[in-house]
From Swiss-Prot:
Protein family: Belongs to the PIGL family.
Effects seen without this gene: Mutant shows a 2-fold reduction in bacillithiol levels. BshB1/bshB2 double mutant does not produce bacillithiol.
A single GO molecular function term of this UniProt record: metal ion binding
InterPro entries attached to this UniProt entry: Bacillithiol_biosynth_BshB1, GlcNAc_PI_deacetylase-related, LmbE-like_dom_sf
Record-listed E.C. numbers: 3.5.1.-
Domain of life: Bacteria
Keyword Calcium: no
Record protein name field: N-acetyl-alpha-D-glucosaminyl L-malate deacetylase 1
Names of the cofactor(s): Zn(2+)
TM ranges: none
Keyword presence, Zinc: yes
Amino acid sequence: MYNADVLAFGAHSDDVEIGMGGTIAKFVKQEKKVMICDLTEAELSSNGTVSLRKEEAAEAARILGADKRIQLTLPDRGLIMSDQAIRSIVTVIRICRPKAVFMPYKKDRHPDHGNAAALVEEAIFSAGIHKYKDEKSLPAHKVSKVYYYMINGFHQPDFVIDISDTIEAKKQSLNAYKSQFIPSKDSVSTPLTNGYIEIVEAREKLYGKEAGVEYAEGFFSKRMLMLDHDVLGGEQ
């Protein structure tokens, strides 16, 4: 078992990088232990293959500096509420034992992203129940902080994190997914192959401008936030 600072869940490999790649790189710079879990193998993606996607995901995790990347095999486009799915995610949570869990924001054009969040929320609750049995009979674990990152779209976040120093790492991690974002003569045209990385960069640029920095990623919090600094910007 691990004692992770952060465990970030995505429905598909590349979700986490899109939503919070810069923040992961920032956490790693701060010597935080960060782990990623992809719920599906993205086997229904229009481009690439499962084996290639795994290679790309491993490279993206290396670029960001994540300590570990876990691959579950829940069905792509089949992230429905089930005991088996929840139990699999509970096992991951109890293995990683994170302080904070990040997951996709529910308001998203892709149903898998919202469904992933619903499953992870259920698993977080069950992971803290001592009598709930996971796949490995691990001890219960209560997650302290729960946050949501954005994949598709632009929403007014609860807070943003400055990623001005790590935006390049984020872009490099996305470019590791050549099969998804870089069109080729054999690729199918999708929203991802039509300037998607540039769109994500523009979004983070806008969040940064609104917050007074160059780039920022936006998040939602399950609970009300207590700031570490006062409204005048000084340290408490």
